[in-house]
Each structure stands twice: as structure tokens, then as C-alpha cells.
């Protein structure tokens, strides 16, 4: 039914290790189910395989950009060769990878997202100070095109600002300085134009950083994360945010719920989310009785 399937993983982005874990999990499921599947590490290897016509479709779990699989580059490559693939197309992938442009689209459509300022990696101390004065502490500083909390800092005082900017500036592209919303962090997985139950994330540390996402064993995940009324509201918001930036197939929308007001604020969209044992899309799917194997199968079926 599927022919020869490439599981695209690894790459050279800052999220390589997570992608390798995701890809191995997906590959194991496909092989157990009798699919002729092979792993392909990175975009150059995929390009060579496509030239040689070695695969009929691609399951993309290549995370990140600049050697990753979420910035539209590899999607354009696959479309050029006429090979179907999982996840969002060129536009949805490229736009979602850029957190600044994503926020601009959401704001233009009246969708709620934290106040922000964009900065170049060469921003002067004066420009950084002006951005902070506009937003007010606390803020989050992050690379505009990275995921998995790579290069992200929470800043509560002026003396920590320079260090946070320097960390984010190690990565390619603009920096995003964003108003820090205090409250519950939630995520809504999208599968086949349907919002899965939200997950409320309860890290044991101060926040949901890289360690809490992929290494810690004590991070708690509450699913569904909200009461029925709020659950319906966040599902509508997540679907609207996903569609606004042209995404399709499957993905994940990260949201904050402000303490006190209960208001939701959109953070970002992930178009090739993790598929590790700690990953959130499999956790949400399991709440509906869908095991990891069935989830992988549903995603691959989107290429037919």
C-alpha cells in the first residue's frame, strides 16, 4: 500500500538527538507492521535517495531548521520530486518555523499571543534595553527559529539580560523577546483536522525546559488539562492557529493560560513534533485510546 518509505531523521539542526529518537521509534513501528521502511539521516542523503528514486513516500521526523525538516526546505525538495510526505507543506512549514512571522499572522487575524519584540543577533545594548522597557519584566528570550527550548531563557531582571541574549544569539536568525505569561503551559495536538485533548504540563523545576522535556522522569502531564468548557475553547483556538499559518496533517500548538484571568495565549506551532517516549502527541492520542503504533499509521496514511 505504501511502497518504500523513507523515515527522515537526524539532520544537522540543534534538535538532531531528539529527531534520532523520534525516527527510530517510527521506523520500528513501520517495520513491525510489514512496511518496507528505511531510515535516511538528513537532507543531503534524502536528496540522493530521491534522485535514485529509492523511495515512494517520506515519513518526516526531521526536527528544526538549517539542516532540519521543519523550515520548508525539505518539503520543497520532496515536492520537486513528486514524492508524498507527512506533515505540512512548504508554506506551512516555513511560516511556522519562524516564530516572529507566525505571531504577525496571528495578530493580524486577532488571535491572542504574548506581546513581543524582534531583535537581530547584532542588536545593540540600547536596542535590547528599549525592547525590555516596552514589554516590562519578566520576559522570555529565544531564537526565533529553534525548538525544543533550545537557546531559551526566562529573564526577570536587567543583570541577566546580556547572558540570555548571548545564548539565543548562538543560533541562526532573529531573536524573539516575548512577554512572559505566568500560568499553566498547555499543548494541543492536531491530527487530521481534529484537536486532540489538551495536555497541561507540570514540570518539577521552574519551567518546561529541554531537560524537563526529554530527560527528566518527574515531569507530570495532565490530560485532558482543562474542564470541558475551557477544553472546547482551547481546541477551537489551536485549530484556528494551526490553519492560520497554513499547516496540515498533524502537528502541535503550544499555549499558555494566564493565571488569574484564565486567558489563553498562543506561543508556537510545531509541524514535525517529537515522537519519543516523552513526547506530547503520543500522550494526547493515548487519551483517545490510540496507541503509538496506530498514531504512526494514521500519520503515514495522510500521504496516500
UniProtKB/Swiss-Prot annotation:
Keywords: ATP-binding, Cell shape, Cell wall biogenesis/degradation, Cytoplasm, Ligase, Magnesium, Manganese, Metal-binding, Nucleotide-binding, Peptidoglycan synthesis. One of its GO terms (cellular component) is cytosol. It is found in: Cytoplasm. Its cofactor is Mg(2+); Mn(2+). Mg(2+) 1 binds at residues 254, 268. Pathway: Cell wall biogenesis; peptidoglycan biosynthesis. One of its GO terms (biological process) is peptidoglycan biosynthetic process. GO terms for molecular function: ATP binding; D-alanine-D-alanine ligase activity; metal ion binding. SUPFAM superfamilies: Glutathione synthetase ATP-binding domain-like, PreATP-grasp domain. Its EC number is 6.3.2.4. Mg(2+) 2 binds at residues 268, 270. The keyword Nucleotide-binding applies. It catalyses: 2 D-alanine + ATP = D-alanyl-D-alanine + ADP + phosphate + H(+). Gene3D superfamilies: 3.40.50.20, ATP-grasp fold, A domain, ATP-grasp fold, B domain. Residues 103-301 form the ATP-grasp domain. It holds the Pfam family Dala_Dala_lig_C. Belongs to the D-alanine--D-alanine ligase family. HAMAP family: Dala_Dala_lig. Cell wall formation. This is D-alanine--D-alanine ligase. It comes from Xylella fastidiosa (strain 9a5c).
Amino acid at each position: 500500500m505504501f511502497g518504500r518509505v523513507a523515515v527522515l531523521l537526524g539532520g544537522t539542526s540543534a534538535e538532531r538527538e531528539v529527531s534520532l529518537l523520534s525516527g527510530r521509534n517510527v521506523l520500528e513501528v513501520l517495520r513491525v507492521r510489514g512496511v518496507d521502511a528505511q531510515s535516511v539521516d538528513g537532507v543531503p542523503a534524502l536528496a540522493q535517495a530521491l534522485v535514485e528514486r529509492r523511495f515512494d513516500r517520506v515519513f518526516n521526523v526531521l526536527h528544526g531548521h538549517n539542516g532540519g525538516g521543519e523550515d520548508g526546505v525539505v518539503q520543497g525538495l520532496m515536492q520537486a520530486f513528486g514524492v508524498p510526505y507527512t506533515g505540512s507543506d512548504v508554506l506551512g512549514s516555513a511560516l511556522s518555523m519562524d516564530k516572529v512571522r507566525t505571531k504577525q499572522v496571528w495578530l493580524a487575524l486577532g488571535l491572542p499571543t504574548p506581546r513581543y519584540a524582534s531583535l537581530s543577533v547584532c542588536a545593540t545594548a540600547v536596542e535590547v534595553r528599549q525592547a525590555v522597557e516596552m514589554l516590562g519584566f519578566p520576559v522570555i528570550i529565544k531564537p526565533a527559529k529553534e525548538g525544543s527550548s533550545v537557546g531559551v531563557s526566562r529573564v526577570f531582571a536587567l543583570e541577566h539580560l546580556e547572558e540570555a541574549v548571548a545564548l539565543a544569539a548562538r543560533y541562526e536568525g532573529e531573536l524573539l523577546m516575548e512577554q512572559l505569561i505566568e500560568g499553566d503551559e498547555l499543548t494541543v495536538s492536531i491530527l487530521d483536522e481534529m484537536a486532540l485533548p489538551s495536555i497541561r504540563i507540570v514540570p518539577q523545576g521552574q519551567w518546561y525546559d529541554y531537560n524537563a522535556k526529554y530527560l527528566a522522569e518527574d515531569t507530570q502531564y495532565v490530560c485532558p488539562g482543562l474542564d470541558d468548557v475551557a477544553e472546547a475553547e482551547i481546541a477551537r483556538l489551536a485549530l484556528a492557529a494551526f490553519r492560520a499559518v497554513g499547516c496540515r496533517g498533524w502537528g502541535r500548538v503550544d499555549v499558555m493560560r494566564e493565571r488569574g484571568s484564565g486567558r489563553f495565549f498562543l506561543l508556537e506551532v510545531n509541524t514535525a513534533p517529537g515522537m519519543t517516549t516523552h513526547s506530547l502527541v503520543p500522550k494526547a492520542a493515548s487519551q483517545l485510546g490510540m496507541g503509538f503504533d496506530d498514531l504512526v499509521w494514521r500519520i503515514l496514511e495522510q500521504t496516500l
